[in-house]
Amino acid sequence: MSPRPPKTRVKLDPLDLAGIDDMLSAEEKAVRAAVRQVCASSIDPYVAEWFESGDLPGVRDLAKELGKLGLLGMHLEGYGCAGMSAVDYGLACLELEASDSGIRSLVSVQGSLAMFAIWEHGTPEQKQEWLPPMATGEAIGCFGLTEPDHGSDPANMRTKARRDGDGDTADWILNGSKMWITNGSVADVAVIWAQTEDGIRGFVVPTDTPGFSARLIKHKMSLRASVTSELVLDGVRLPNDAVFPEVRGLVGPLSCLNEAR
């Protein structure tokens, strides 16, 4: 009977049991290191206080800092976006998540929902107006799909948009509400999905439009270092060029959710 070979011990890194580091390029590791550094300097020292207070003071300054690093819409091409890979984006989100899920939510909702919706479905004018300032953090966006009564059933959303007049160039009037909207109370622009006679349509809504309001949701059990809001649209009048021109139906919002996830 031949002797058993000696056992070899494999030294495992408890922080990298799957050996992911060996699969990353030098550039990808550099992206991760840069995000880790900004988390250590600008998020980690304050996140416990933010969690306790249930607030994110200085969110605009933080957004600008993240924008300087290229983290806002970082996987999109053009319009001032970094055009990085999905791996880069995933590594950045992992580092942000390690600091706090609320901060990761700020970045992913800005880039993968609000910015992606405009980038994918918007007109050239909508893209040029909003994407460059959103990429730098000068403008913050939110994504209005979930509703108080239809969070997981967007096909039955109650928010309505109707034409005010005849013809294809008439203004739109929006009425309804959205709930649990990340960035809502600090957003400069909201992507709002609403029922129309032609199915669900998407609208680019500047948040200073009369009839638009946002209420901060407090006393949350989780994502406390995140701005979460209820949006109310009370007779919000928008010009025809505020609508996404081509996309209709659930394919619009669901394409954005697929991108974000």
Features from the language model and the residues they span:
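Glycine-rich phosphate/pyrophosphate-binding beta-alpha loops
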Residues: 151, 179-185, 259-261
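Active-site-adjacent elements of ketosynthase-type condensing enzymes
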Residues: 149-158
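A short core secondary-structure module
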Residues: 170-171, 175-215
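N-terminal glycine-rich flavin-associated loop
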Residues: 105-125, 151
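A short, Trp-centered hydrophobic/proline-enriched beta-strand micro-motif
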Residues: 137-145
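Glycine-rich beta->alpha junctions and the first turn(s) of the following alpha-helix
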Residues: 20-24, 31, 213-261
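A structural signal for short hydrophobic beta-strand segments in well-ordered beta-sheet cores
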Residues: 159-163
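Amphipathic, small/basic residue-rich leader segments at the start of a protein or domain
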Residues: 1-106, 126-129, 133-136, 167
